[in-house]
Swiss-Prot record:
HAMAP family in alphabetical order: OadC
Similarity comment: family membership: Belongs to the isocitrate lyase/PEP mutase superfamily. Oxaloacetate decarboxylase family.
Role noted for this protein: Catalyzes the decarboxylation of oxaloacetate into pyruvate. Seems to play a role in maintaining cellular concentrations of bicarbonate and pyruvate.
PANTHER family to which the protein is assigned, alphabetical: OXALOACETATE DECARBOXYLASE (PTHR42905:SF3), PHOSPHOENOLPYRUVATE CARBOXYLASE (PTHR42905)
Quaternary structure note: Homotetramer; dimer of dimers.
Protein name, UniProt field: Oxaloacetate decarboxylase
E.C. number(s) listed in UniProt: 4.1.1.112
Entry keywords, A to Z: Decarboxylase, Lyase, Magnesium, Metal-binding
GO terms for biological process, alphabetical: oxaloacetate metabolic process; propionate catabolic process, 2-methylcitrate cycle; pyruvate biosynthetic process
Residues reported to bind Mg(2+): 85
GO molecular function: magnesium ion binding; methylisocitrate lyase activity; oxaloacetate decarboxylase activity
Pfam families per record: PEP_mutase (PF13714)
Cofactor: record remark: Binds 1 Mg(2+) ion per subunit.
Length: 289
C-alpha cells in the first residue's frame, strides 16, 4: 500500500497542470533531505547511480541488482516518490520484464525505458539507437510485466539528438499507442521542437535537462511538460565537498577547522535520531534524554 501511495503521487503530478522539477536523489541521505525540503518527486538517474554505487562514469556498467538494491534503500529511508532511470532495461525485452519486476518490488514510483543502444557498440564513437520495433517491444514488455497497475511506465527516446525530431515523434507516438503513462524526451533544444512534440502526442511529457531556452516553466506546463529533470547537481556538490574536506585533512587541518560541515542538528534530522530515541524508549526501556 505504501508503494501505491507513492505511485499515486507521481500519477497526480503527471495528470496535473504544473511542471515539476524533481530532486536528484541517489542514496538514503539525499532522498531524506529532498523529502524534508518538500520536493514532490525524486529522480534516480542512471549516471548518478553509476557514480554513487560504482564510482564509474555513465557507460552502462551498473547491474540491475545494484540499481534495484539502491532504490530499495531509498524507498526504506523516505516516502518521497521516485522516478527511476532504468536505462535500456538491462538487455532485451525479456530483460526489461525482469527490470520492471525488480524495481516495482524495490518501491519505485515509476521507471523509464529508453531506446539508446547500450552498452556502447564496438567501433561506434557516437550514441546509437535500437530500432523502433525493438524499442516498442521493450515498452510492451515493460507494460506487461508490472504487477501493480499504478506503477508508472515512461517511454523514453533520445532520437531528437541522435537521428531526428521526426524519428523521435514517430517512436513516441508508437509508445503512446502501446499504453505508456508518459513520454520522456532527451535532446530537445528549441521551442519549435517541443511545440511539434506536444502537437503530435497527447500524453504527459518529461524533459531531460532542458537548455536555457526551455526554462520558462509556465510555457513548459502549457506544452504538457509535467517533469523537467534539472541535472544532477547534488551528487556533484557532495563530491566536491568530500574532496575539499579530505584535501584539507591530508594537508594537516584539524577536523574542527573545517568549514561547510553539516550541523549536528542536520545530522540528527537526516538520521531521524529523535525517532530512533523514541523507539528505544518504547521497545528497549531506554530513558529519553
Amino acid at each position: 500500500m505504501a508503494w501505491r501511495n507513492r505511485r499515486g503521487a507521481l500519477r497526480a503530478i503527471l495528470s496535473g497542470s504544473a511542471c515539476v522539477r524533481p530532486a536528484s536523489v541517489y542514496d538514503a541521505i539525499s532522498i531524506r533531505i529532498a523529502d524534508d525540503l518538500g520536493f514532490p518527486l525524486g529522480m534516480f538517474g542512471g549516471s548518478v547511480a553509476s557514480l554513487a554505487i560504482l564510482g564509474d562514469p555513465d557507460i552502462a556498467l551498473i547491474t540491475l541488482t545494484e540499481l534495484a538494491e539502491q532504490m530499495r534503500r531509498m524507498a526504506r529511508a523516505a516516502a518521497l516518490p521516485v522516478l527511476v532511470d532504468a536505462d535500456h532495461g538491462y538487455g532485451n525485452a525479456l530483460n526489461v520484464r525482469r527490470t520492471v519486476q525488480e524495481l516495482e518490488a524495490a518501491g519505485a514510483a515509476g521507471l523509464t525505458i529508453e531506446d539508446t543502444l547500450l552498452p556502447q557498440a564496438y567501433g561506434e564513437a557516437s550514441p546509437q539507437l535500437i530500432s523502433r520495433e525493438e524499442g516498442l517491444g521493450k515498452i510492451k514488455a515493460a507494460l506487461d510485466a508490472r504487477l501493480d497497475p499504478s506503477l508508472v511506465i515512461v517511454g523514453r527516446t533520445g532520437a531528437c539528438a541522435i537521428t531526428s525530431l521526426d524519428d523521435a515523434i514517430d517512436r513516441a507516438v508508437a509508445y503512446q499507442a502501446a499504453g505508456v503513462d508518459a513520454l520522456f524526451f532527451t535532446g530537445v533544444k528549441t521551442r519549435p521542437q517541443l511545440d511539434a512534440i506536444a502537437a503530435a502526442t497527447t500524453l504527459p511529457i518529461v524533459l531531460g535537462s532542458p537548455p536555457a531556452e526551455l526554462t520558462d516553466w509556465d510555457y513548459l506546463a502549457a506544452q504538457r511538460v509535467r517533469i523537467a529533470v534539472q541535472g544532477h547537481a547534488p551528487i556533484a556538490a557532495a563530491t566536491e565537498a568530500v574532496s575539499k574536506a579530505l584535501s584539507a585533512l591530508r594537508d594537516g587541518a584539524a577536523p574542527k577547522q573545517l568549514t561547510g560541515l553539516a550541523s549536528a542538528e542536520l545530522i540528527d534530522r537526516v538520521t531521524r535520531a529523535s525517532l530512533v530515541e523514541e523507539r528505544g524508549a518504547q521497545f528497549l526501556g531506554l530513558k529519553r534524554e
